């Protein structure tokens, strides 16, 4: 536009210049310079009296090119004038590159048919030689617990704790025997607890515990517990919120999987480790027995043996699979850990937090069976009966559909409420009758139950059983560090696993969980006790130390005693066991 018209039409953009002005001003500016080559577009706003009853809109010739013919109301109307040409002022403007448009992922449309599922998985035929080997060893409770807190793990904790104390200019000199004593006190605190842990060492008759006081001094325990460490601070991963306990998690997962019973059915879910401090990874779960603490993803057997665990860090620190949410990605990690022992037709059960049709499809491709309750918006538009309609039908009614391409079934069942359940391995048939309490009739009635619902209810509770066992006698002693409660959780999980193996391997002489924990705590504390001024040692400690293959030496004794094995007179004894034993009987006496 000409310079005069530019004075009237100010304001510029990247591609055009727009300003509101009076029509008469614009026409006068255009008449002053006829040499303007830019194309002008003028938009005239309606006059002020456009809504009035009388207008002078017909007062001139419409074909005239001059503005004099226009009525006054139009000449004084506001206009928008746009210059579509290029001007000098556009040279300094930076053009923004166009954003790349992401291609939308087109999901395949599933075809749902009302029929029962036809799974193509093989049957379970695997045996477990490792459990048979454990049965033949007849391990004691301490031996079973030390399958997880083995010599390598104990020495690792000792080395890291001494390293951390040395970095703080403290000569701790922790030994493996002292660490086991500390573990014994932590285990004992699960079934004998005081408001203050120092009361274990008080001389007051109402609180003194001689087993703890004789095993280790109070200040020594406090010093060891305050410097307990599990990683080198100079090699921590900044992207891992649990970097200070990550080496322990890796070791425990390895031991848990190594000695896990090889079974067909597994359960996956969430567990909570109680914690009330200030930590970013702490979570709140309303309606849970443990509402506040660290959330831990857990994979267990149907009986409650913990096979694999991973503390939750959220999507910021844990990148989920692109096609799944965080929960589904954790299920895949658990399945990958299971398949390290072999690609077998495992059957995984989980609840609606994890289940989706997409997850069922991925697990099917991995050769893994899965069943779980599912939220309606994750069924990929499976055309089932409306829940309101199903509620009007009698209890036990159900509707179901199967995906034709991947043999995935979605069933909606009316029990006390309407529940959706999905599976890639179990179908509707056979439909069984189950007993339910009827509030209206005040009696129990028989309702129909599909096969996949029955199997789900029987096998899904593994994580809940583990939580129940841990909560009964969990470690009560806590420290100032944020991971002290997590360490207590790991110890409790190892005790639960050891007890589960005890129930499998020692079916003739089983003990309950409390007696199992007491046995381990007493052995660890008695083995570190100062026995110089005490009488004979307990029968329990003698049995454990006799077969540990550590520190047994044959020495001469002045007074002849009877051999503990052949019962004849001997002048030699075992230095550790303090039992008379012949040289020829020494080896046989110390082997089970």
From Swiss-Prot:
Residues 31-69 are annotated as: Disordered. It comes from the Eukaryota. InterPro entries: PGBD, PiggyBac_TE-derived. GO terms for molecular function: sequence-specific DNA binding. It comes from Homo sapiens (Human). This is PiggyBac transposable element-derived protein 2.
